[in-house]
C-alpha cells in the first residue's frame, strides 16, 4: 500500500515527509526530490532510525529508539508557533523525552540532529516563504520557489498555494474591528466616525477645529453609531452650534467596499446605515433640525481628506461646481453648512466676492456690416454653444463606419450579451466591460459585415465598465479620434451612435445634462436615451471627437450615464508604444476552432475560481484529485479574498482521441482582502477523457511574483 505525503525537509540522504495522516516519516532521498514536493512510497522504504541522540535532550538523556512508525516518545507539543521568522522563536517546545531543560552546551539553534524542524503546518502563522537554503531555517517567508507539483489537488488554480502562503489564521483575520464604513456629521463642526460591521465606533476624527471642541471629553469608542451621533449633536447643541432656529445637519457616509462581503451587498449595507442614522436623528427629538444624508465613494472621501474637508462638505463643493457656481475649497471650509446648502439649492453666488468686470466699450457709431469682419488678430469673445455647428448627416455616417457590433458567446455558441464598440487603433476596440466579462468567445462585426475573432482584453476597468479588446488580426476599421471631458460643459450638444438594431447604426442626438452622476466617481449624464443594445458605443462632441462611452445600467438611478473617453485615451497612448503583435493580452478569450474543447477545460477551471464555484472547479478534475480539505480551503479563500484570475494564453501542445496536453499562463491579482502578493502561473496540464468528458488529471507549474 502506497503512503503519500509532502516533503517538509531534506537532510543529507534522507527526505522527511509529512503524510496525509500527519505522521512524519524519513525515506531515502532521490536526486529529484525537493521541499514541497508531493511523493508516494511503500512502507518498506521508511527509514528505521537506531539510537539517535538529540541535542535538545538534557545531558545523559536519550530517546532510545525511533521505530518505523515515527512516534517519538513524549514528542507531542510543538505548537503555538507565532511569527515564524526566527529559528529559535518556538514556544512551548519543552516536551522532548520529558526533558525539563536543555543542555548547557547545546547550540542556541532549535535543532534536533538528523530530525530537525518538526513543524505542524496547521499551526504556523504568517507563513509566506519557503527557501531552499542549506541552513536548517525558514526565513523571510515571502517567496515560494522551485516547488514542483506543489499540490495534487489545486496546482492548476493555486488554491493550495494561497492557503499555504498565508496560513488559515492570517486569512481569517477579518474581524468586526476592521474599517467597515465612514460617517461624517456636519453642523459647523465636522466629525467623522470610522465604524465596524456592527456599526460600533472604532475611531473618531475631528476634521476641523470646531470638531475638536465638540469631541473634547466624549468617550465614543465602542459606542454604537446611533448613540455616538446623539452624543455629538447634543454636545454641539450645548456649545451653541445648534440654536433654536432652523438647523441643518449634513450626514455623509462612505462604505469601505474594498471588503468583498461589503461590496457584494453594497445597496443593502447603505440602506442599513441610513436607517441607523435616521434613528439617531429621531432620538434627538429636536424639531429645529433639518437633516440631509448623502453617500460618497472612497475616492471622493480620500479627496475630501486631502483638502481637509469632511465628506459632506466636499460633496457640497462638487454639487456647487456641477451647477456652475464659482466656489473655492477655502470658501467651503469657512462657510456655515446652512449657508452652503441654501446657496446651492438657490443656485446663487456663495458670497458677494467682487469679480473683475471688463471696462465698458463705447458703442461704435456705424454698425459694422457682414463684410466688415473682425481682423483675425483682434480679441474676440468665445462662441456660445449655439454657435457651434451641428455634425452633418454625412459626417455622422463616416463616424459610424468605425462603430462595431460586439457579441459574446458561451461555450455552446449561445449569445450571452451584445452591444456596441468602436475602433480606437489598428485592431483595438473600446466597449463596456460588462458586455465581454462572461464571454468565452467574443466576436466583432464591422460596418461592412466582416466578422473578427477577439484574441482577448488588453485593458479593463470593472468599476468604470470599460474594456479594450484586441482582435486576432489587424482590421481595416478606421480608429476614431478621442477627446476629453474637459471640453464639455452642461448643455453641450452631443451625438451618440450605437448598434441597437444589430448591424445597423442608430443615432441619438442630445446634450450634456450633468457632469456628475450620484454614486459614480466619474460619469456624465446625457439627456439622450441609451438603449441596452447600444451600450458601449461612442458619444461625440460637435467636432467629431469621442468624449464618452455609453454605459447602460452602470447607474442605479436609471440615468443615461456616459464614461469619459479620457480613460480610454490614456490606454491608447500607452499601447501606442507597441506594435500590434506585441500588445499583450491580459484576459484571454477563446475561438471556436479544433482546439476549443481542450482549451475550454483550462478556461473553465480558472473561471470557476473567479466565480467562486467549487462544484465546477472540482468537476474539471478527475475524481482522484478531489479532497474535502481542499474544498474547505477554497471556502476560506472565497470568503476572505476577492481575486481576479486572468488567463493570458492557452495553447494545445498535443492531442489524441484519449489524451491531450495544454500549456497556459494566467495571473492572480488581489482586488480585495488581506495582504496578498500577485503572481503569474506558467503551467502545463494533462487531460484525459472520462465518460466522454475531458478532465485534468495532472499539471506542472512555475510561479513568479508580479506587481
From Swiss-Prot:
Topology of this chain in the membrane: Single-pass membrane protein
Superkingdom, taxonomy of origin: Bacteria
Bias (Low complexity): 368-379
TM stretches of this protein: 150-172
Compartments where located: Cell membrane
GO terms of biological process kind: proteolysis
Keyword Aminoacyl-tRNA synthetase belongs to the record: no
Record carries keyword Transmembrane: yes
Topology, Extracellular side: 173-707
Molecular function GO labels: serine-type endopeptidase activity
Coiled-coil residue windows: 256-283
PANTHER family: PROTEASE DO-LIKE 5, CHLOROPLASTIC (PTHR43019:SF23), SERINE ENDOPROTEASE DEGS (PTHR43019)
This protein's name: Anti-sigma-I factor RsgI9
UniProt source species: Acetivibrio thermocellus (strain ATCC 27405 / DSM 1237 / JCM 9322 / NBRC 103400 / NCIMB 10682 / NRRL B-4536 / VPI 7372) (Clostridium thermocellum)
Lineage: Bacteria, Bacillati, Bacillota, Clostridia, Eubacteriales
